[in-house]
């Protein structure tokens, strides 16, 4: 019987598969990875991330206030003139027509802009879980820039506060922050907007804590301070570091002058209280008027301001320049 011939290659043992060895990890590489992961974990903790977010909110709020002030100045130059004594027709027509346009926008386009920005921000904190519609930010920007720039006796602080709160609310919702952080983020933005408007971060922090939050919170104080400071730094980068009011150097010549300052403080507080009482008295009466008067109320106020401005142009606008020149 002939033997079956088996090919030599058939009985050759198969080559062992190549085993890939993982690259050697040195002790230095392990330390670098550990430090990187520890740094990321440190930064990504929500409380620390919230502080970084406060700086971002301050920057965006500061930019918004810069644009807001430039819009007011552009509107004033366009509708009135660069001087404080523009021509007679412009003094009367500019605030009147601007009031009519503001009424139309507030009724049909931006209904959320009506009322006090401080009260709306407080409602957002305690009722709406920090929610401020971004359309309110746009509406406040447009209507208030038009109203103040046309000469109506309004200040940019209140709309700046609400715009800052709205910007913070938008950023917080976009990042899906927790409900607790969303409630706190509106006052953070409010402080940033107010600080940039006043160029005074400390005053803005104290105002927001007292008026918007109502209580001292150690957890939110750091974020509020960071937002206020970063917004002022941003604003000063574009508009300069000049204070809102320049106070000349003075010294007390005699102790008797302190009595005059006490009287001045009492008189100023009394005048402010009287103005507040007038506002409280007239507001419900105006709200009781027929709804169609909403279209003409801002125009009527603008007409009254324009008529007064013919003789006293200092009453038109925010009035900062007049106070600074006093």
PLM feature spans:
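Alpha-helical transmembrane segments and immediately membrane-proximal extracytoplasmic
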Residues: 1-326
């Amino acid at each position: 019987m002939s033997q079956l011939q088996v090919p030599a290659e058939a009985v050759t043992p198969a080559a062992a598969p190549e085993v890939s060895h993982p690259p050697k990890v040195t002790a230095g590489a392990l330390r670098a990875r550990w430090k990187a992961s520890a740094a990321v974990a440190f930064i990504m903790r929500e409380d620390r991330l919230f502080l970084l977010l406060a700086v971002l909110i301050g920057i965006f709020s500061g930019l918004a206030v810069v644009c807001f002030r430039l819009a007011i100045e552009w509107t004033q130059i366009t509708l009135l003139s660069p001087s404080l004594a523009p021509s007679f027709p412009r003094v009367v027509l500019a605030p009147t027509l601007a009031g009519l346009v503001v009424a139309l926008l507030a009724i049909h386009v931006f209904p959320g802009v009506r009322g006090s920005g401080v009260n709306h921000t407080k409602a957002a904190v305690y009722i709406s879980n920090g929610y401020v519609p971004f359309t309110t930010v746009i509406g406040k920007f447009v209507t208030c820039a038009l109203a103040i720039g046309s000469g109506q006796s309004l200040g940019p602080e209140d709309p700046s506060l609400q715009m800052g709160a709205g910007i913070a609310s938008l950023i917080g919702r976009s990042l899906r922050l927790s409900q607790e952080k969303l409630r706190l983020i509106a006052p953070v933005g409010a402080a940033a907007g107010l600080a940039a408007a006043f160029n005074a971060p400390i005053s803005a922090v104290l105002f927001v804590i007292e008026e918007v939050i109502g209580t001292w919170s150690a957890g939110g104080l750091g974020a509020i301070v960071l937002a206020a400071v970063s917004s002022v730094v941003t604003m000063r980068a574009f508009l300069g570091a000049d204070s809102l009011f320049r106070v000349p150097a003075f010294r007390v010549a005699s102790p008797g002058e302190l009595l005059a300052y006490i009287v001045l403080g009492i008189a100023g507080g009394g005048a402010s209280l009287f103005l507040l009482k007038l506002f409280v008295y007239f507001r419900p009466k105006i709200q009781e008027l027929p709804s169609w008067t909403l279209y003409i109320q801002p125009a009527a106020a603008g007409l009254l301001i324009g008529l007064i401005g013919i003789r006293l142009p200092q009453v038109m606008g925010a009035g900062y320049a007049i106070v600074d020149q006093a």
